[in-house]
Amino acid sequence: SFSLAEAMHQEIKAVTDKPVKLVINENGQGHAMLGNSYWAELGIDILAHEAAIDEVKDNGYQILEEMKRYNREKADGTAVITANISFSEKYVFTLGGIKFEILHLGDAHGPGDTQVWIPQWSLMIAGDIAFHERMLPIFENTCTRCWIETWKTSFAPLNPLYIIPGHGHPTNLPQVEKY
């Protein structure tokens, strides 16, 4: 939501005076995109996979209305805003001498699942392709066969030393493979 993105921004400001340069939507679900209105208001670019953008265009207003039903006070100021930058397979940029590879490794948890791979640190910000300390949720648009195939052929071969899962604490590959 707008207020959650604003609170996150305050946390960022508490540890650095550097500006936010880019916001990456990990997929098209509400928890990933309902804060876009805050970042867009600040003029910050928002990146998402093209399938996540389609998901927001197709279902964003319904997702926002559902959020308002259970969390009305935290929905104030929230609007459905799609990412202004899209990618299909990979988006690469360097910031502060660090190379970031924004990846869509394949279908998994939901439309447009996105990962951030930082090769020099062997760090994967996995998004919702990886869970830790909880059961994987299966939704109507989840392709479990695709998820397993994407994991085996694209995610696991990267062999990240560190993984920040979509849900759960930072961990490693053997731990997320349990879930």
Question: What residues fall within each predicted segment?
Answer:
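Active-site HxH/HxHxD metal-binding segment of metal-dependent hydrolases
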Residues: 3-6, 10-85, 89-92, 111
